Amino acid sequence: MIIVLSPAKSLDYDTPAHVPSYTKPAFVDDASELIDGLRKLSPQDIATLMDISDPLARLNFQRYADWSPTFSPANAKQAVLAFNGDVYEGFDAKSLSAADLDYAQQHVRVLSGLYGLLRPLDLLQPYRLEMGTRFANARGKDLYAFWGDRITRALNEQLETRSGAARVLVNCASTEYFKSVKPKLLAAPVVTPVFEDWKGGRYKIISFHAKRARGLMARYIVENRIAEPAALKDFAMEDYVFDAAASNDSTYVYRRRIGE
């Protein structure tokens, strides 16, 4: 089983890492190519391209200038400890044991606009480059064209080491990021957990709740060493319950009803 997550825009480089081990990203050469292109942009260009504020554009202009193809704990931090958004609050890597993080290293992957595909302990230099950014490059009009089938092939290398029901990809990423994966080329079926909350008289996806829940699901898989998708139906964290009637073989729906 391989779980894919989206990255986070919010980053934490202030909290010291609680584990010393780290690895190097697989696609550093590709990231360097993107950085070379990003360095040609002015802060105003970045603000327009990414639809962000001027201060945030200046911050990322400097990040691109500072970025180095040489990674070390002096200029980078393990990805799963650096990302700091809703998904990673749910995953809460800071409270995972070294053994859990080692398991995550084998089973969790993070999709990234700049880095392509990251393992949890891959060192990450600070950046902002969302996968949906229409950043024209030598390979095409956007980042989906840039990455092509590279991410899918890297996932297949891992999936092909699994067998039977354990050869499955669990999609805990957003639609924007999972578009960088080509399911028809994957060497495994895809199961997508969907999290819905009761609001306004019906169940619906509420973005920040769903993001946190996807992180919780990844944590649940890691802590319980889950290898086959059937066991995902037992997930019941923070009052979410599997709804068999709303689910099918490729979409597992979890619902929560609180306060109504």
UniProtKB/Swiss-Prot annotation:
One of its GO terms (biological process) is response to hydroperoxide. Signal peptide: none annotated. It holds the Pfam family H2O2_YaaD. GO terms for cellular component: cytosol. It comes from the Bacteria. Belongs to the UPF0246 family. NCBIfam families: PRK02101.1-1, PRK02101.1-3. This is UPF0246 protein BamMC406_2140. The lineage of its organism: Bacteria, Pseudomonadati, Pseudomonadota, Betaproteobacteria, Burkholderiales.
